[in-house]
Amino acid sequence: MFEDIQLIYMNIKILRFWALLYDKNLRRYVCIGLASFHIFTQIVYMMSTNEGLTGIIRNSYMLVLWINTVLRAYLLLADHDRYLALIQKLTEAYYDLLNLNDSYISEILDQVNKVGKLMARGNLFFGMLTSMGFGLYPLSSSERVLPFGSKIPGLNEYESPYYEMWYIFQMLITPMGCCMYIPYTSLIVGLIMFGIVRCKALQHRLRQVALKHPYGDRDPRELREEIIACIRYQQSIIEYMDHINELTTMMFLFELMAFSALLCALLFMLIIVSGTSQLIIVCMYINMILAQILALYWYANELREQNLAVATAAYETEWFTFDVPLRKNILFMMMRAQRPAAILLGNIRPITLELFQNLLNTTYTFFTVLKRVYG
C-alpha cells in the first residue's frame, strides 16, 4: 500500500504487524497486555527496592521508557482514525506532487524517501543495540540482576527457576517494545519531513511564477488562479501541521520532561558506575535518548525554517508588478509565512534546535550540581 512512499513504509509495516495501525488482531492485545503487566511489576519493584543509587537510576530509565512505549501504543489506538486520516493526507499530497512530473520535486521526493528509509533502519539498529545492552547488563554484574528491575508479589524473582523464566520473558518482550516505540517515533519524524518537502514544493512553485508569468507578457486571469492556488496550498500545509500537533504535542512535552531528568541522571551514573562494561551500557542508553530527541528536534526546526522561507519565495514573484488585489494577497501570504507554523511542545513553544540546546544546557547544569554534591 505504501511501497512507493519509503519515507513511512517500514514504520507503518511494523505498526501494522502489531495491529496498532489499520489491522485489529490478537497481536495488539498480546503486546500491550504483556507490556502493561511488565510496567506493573516494575512499579512494584521500584516501590520495594533497596538497591543503591545506580540501580535506582537505571531502573527509573527502564520504567520511563516502557511507560512511554505503552503510552504511544494507547495513543495510536485512542486516535486511530485521526492517525489514519493524517497518513491519508500525506499519501494524497505525495502523489499530487509526484504527478506534477517536475524534476526538482521528483528529486526532493527521492531524497526524502532515502533519508526516511535510512533513519527508520538506523533507529531500529540503535534499538537493537540498546536491547542488547539490556540483556548484557546482568552478565556484567557480580550478583543476580534482571535486565529490568521488576517484582511479582509473592515470588522471589532471583531464585531458580523463576530467575531464568523471568529473564527469558524480559528478553522476549524487549524486541516487542522496540517495535512499539521506535517505529512510532520514526513515523512522526517522517510526517514532519514530508511537511518540509511540501514547503520546498511551495517555494519552488512561487519562484516559477516570475518565469511563467513575466511582466508585460502575462494573462491576469491565469496569474490570479496561480497565486490563489499557492495560498490554498500554504493553508493546506498549515492544516497538515496542526493535525500533527493535535496528535503529538502533549506527548512531546511528557518526553521532554522525562528524558531531561533521565539524561541528567544517566550522566551522573557515568561517574559512579564501576567497570568498563557498565560504562559502555550506560553510554548506549544516553545515545538512544539523544538519537531519538535530536532527530525530532532537527526536522521540526527545519520545518519551521522552511515555512519561514516561503515568505522569501513569495517576495521573488515580482509581486510589486501585480494588480493591487493580487499584491494584497501576496502580502498576506508573506505575513503569514513570517509567523511560521511549527511543531509545538505542549501547545506552548515551537520545537527548535535552540530548545534542544537549552535542554542540554539545563541537563548539564543539574548534572554539575549532582556531581558537586555526591562526587
UniProtKB/Swiss-Prot annotation:
GO MF, one annotated term: olfactory receptor activity
One BP annotation, GO: sensory perception of smell
A matching Pfam family: 7tm_6
Tree of life domain: Eukaryota
Extracellular-side segments: 50-60, 143-176, 273-278, 364-375
Main localization of the protein described in the UniProt heading: membrane
Bilayer-spanning residue ranges: 29-49, 61-77, 122-142, 177-197, 252-272, 279-299, 343-363
Coiled-coil intervals, chain numbering: none
Subcellular location: Cell membrane
InterPro entries per UniProt: 7tm6_olfct_rcpt (IPR004117)
Keywords: Cell membrane, Membrane, Olfaction, Receptor, Sensory transduction, Transducer, Transmembrane, Transmembrane helix
Record topological domains on the Cytoplasmic side: 1-28, 78-121, 198-251, 300-342
Topology relative to the membrane: Multi-pass membrane protein
Tissue and organ expression note: Expressed in olfactory sensory neurons in the antenna.
GO CC terms in record: dendrite membrane; membrane; plasma membrane
Function text: Odorant receptor which mediates acceptance or avoidance behavior, depending on its substrates. The odorant receptor repertoire encodes a large collection of odor stimuli that vary widely in identity, intensity, and duration. May form a complex with Orco to form odorant-sensing units, providing sensitive and prolonged odorant signaling and calcium permeability.
Family: Belongs to the insect chemoreceptor superfamily. Heteromeric odorant receptor channel (TC 1.A.69) family. Or30a subfamily.
Quaternary assembly: Interacts with Orco. Complexes exist early in the endomembrane system in olfactory sensory neurons (OSNs), coupling these complexes to the conserved ciliary trafficking pathway.
Name of the molecule in the record: Odorant receptor 49b
Taxonomic source organism: Drosophila melanogaster (Fruit fly)
High-level lineage: Eukaryota, Metazoa, Ecdysozoa, Arthropoda, Hexapoda
Gene this protein is translated from: Or49b
